[in-house]
């Protein structure tokens, strides 16, 4: 049952609850609509989901069981300019696992059409890894390959060129 899953409140005036496989996220439809044309359509009048008015008192639950819970959580925290309190570094991509999770989030951003928003936030932290000395600093080749794939998925041509140049 979805209600037994934890709910993460990204904003106190969230009017939508995204119900994922293992968690629920209370988010702002306005923020997601601004960042994503897919969410804009989903929350608009042409979809059943968007035909009812939302309110923070009675947030609308939207099931997204096919999306990766961790990736959607990271993406929503990023779009809401919030930091997951349980995660010391939301863009910790120096480990192979962190880079793989970033790639999964990038694929989700691509799915929802908000790659540009991720690019703006991730450019500075990722620029460190475009330097060849990153390999000497302990970043694995596998982690770098995940990051290169993420830059490709995000259509971040500048970072992709830096990573592969």
Residue ranges and their predicted role:
Residues 33-43:
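Short active-site loop/helix that positions an aromatic residue
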Residues 54-62, 66-74:
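Eukaryotic helix-linker segments that join adjacent hydrophobic helices
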């Amino acid at each position: 049952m979805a209600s037994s899953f934890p709910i993460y409140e990204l904003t106190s005036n969230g009017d939508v609850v995204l119900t994922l496989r293992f968690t629920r996220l209370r988010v702002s439809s306005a923020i997601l609509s601004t960042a994503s044309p897919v969410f804009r359509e989903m929350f608009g009048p042409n979809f059943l989901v968007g035909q009812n008015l939302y309110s923070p008192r009675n947030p609308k639950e939207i099931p997204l069981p096919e999306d990766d819970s961790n990736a959607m959580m990271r993406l929503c925290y990023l779009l809401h300019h919030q930091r997951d309190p349980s995660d010391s570094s939301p863009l910790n991509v120096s480990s192979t696992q962190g880079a793989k999770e970033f790639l999964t989030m990038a694929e989700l951003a691509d799915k929802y059409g908000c790659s540009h928003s991720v690019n703006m936030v991730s450019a500075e932290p990722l620029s460190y890894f475009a330097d060849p000395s990153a390999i000497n600093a302990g970043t694995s080749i596998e982690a770098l390959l995940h990051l290169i794939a993420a830059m490709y998925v995000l259509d971040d041509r500048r970072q992709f060129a830096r990573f592969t140049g």
